[in-house]
């Protein structure tokens, strides 16, 4: 019996997906360790265990590969955020959950922070060129806007809060602390990355954000 003609194309597709996935994972580690300028295509190929020519075949050049890594990086965090099901929670709990998730995700994925640092060094031109990156972030803004509006209607949250500004504040409170933990620990003479310090930071961030959002009771 002749082989099914659909088998070979399906195998090739699976092989291509595996190869691209391996290259993206290797590139993520290389860019996180060396930045865009210091990353080397031969090291990426070596990390992935694949021929360097496949990088150019699938991605074109180093800039396009870096853009693909950034897109994947945002896709991963946005997919994790979806599992929070923020719209199923009461507004205050939804905000607390998002603050905690952001903090814990950054702790678990230090490469996320270093990749963003590298992207910012290049004025985020790779993200400016990526429609996909903007599409990935839009649902988060819409979800946060819905949480804020529900809280406003319930008389819990103040009105007029920009969901983008709020998310920047949530992310920034974690990002600055973790990106600068070594220098901050040195200049203040205390280890800001102990378990106790991390727990205190999380509580502080949640109170800062909710302190801004919560509607003051009438006098």
Predicted stretch roles:
Residues 1-7, 101-104, 108, 138-154, ...:
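C-terminal peripheral helix-coil segments that are non-catalytic and often amphipathic
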Residues 19-27, 44, 69-73, 77, ...:
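Generic hydrophobic, amphipathic alpha-helix propensity
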Residues 23-31, 102, 209:
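Short hydrophobic clusters on alpha-helical segments that form packing/core surfaces
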Residues 33-37, 87-88, 109, 154:
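Short coil/turn segments at alpha/beta junctions that flank glycine-rich nucleotide-binding fingerprints
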Residues 82-114, 134-137, 141-143, 163-167, ...:
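Hydrophobic alpha-helical connector segments
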């Amino acid at each position: 019996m002749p082989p099914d003609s659909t088998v070979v194309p399906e195998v090739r597709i699976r092989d291509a997906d595996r190869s691209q996935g391996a290259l993206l994972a290797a590139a993520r580690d290389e860019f996180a360790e060396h930045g865009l300028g210091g990353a080397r295509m031969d090291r990426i190929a070596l990390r992935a265990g694949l021929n360097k020519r496949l990088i150019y075949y699938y991605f074109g050049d180093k800039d396009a590969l870096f853009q693909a890594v950034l897109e994947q990086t945002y896709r991963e965090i946005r997919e994790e955020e979806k599992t929070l099901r923020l719209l199923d929670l009461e507004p205050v709990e939804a905000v607390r959950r998002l603050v905690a998730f952001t903090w814990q995700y950054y702790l678990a994925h230090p490469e996320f922070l270093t990749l963003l640092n590298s992207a910012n060094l290049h004025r985020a031109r790779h993200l400016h060129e990526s429609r996909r990156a903007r599409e990935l972030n839009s649902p988060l803004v819409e979800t946060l806007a819905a949480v804020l509006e529900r809280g406003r209607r319930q008389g819990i949250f103040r009105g007029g809060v920009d969901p983008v500004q709020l998310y920047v504040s949530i992310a920034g409170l974690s990002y600055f602390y973790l990106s600068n933990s070594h220098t901050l620990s040195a200049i203040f003479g205390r280890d800001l990355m102990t378990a106790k310090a991390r727990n205190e930071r999380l509580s502080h961030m949640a109170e800062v954000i909710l302190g801004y959002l919560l509607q003051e009771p009438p006098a």
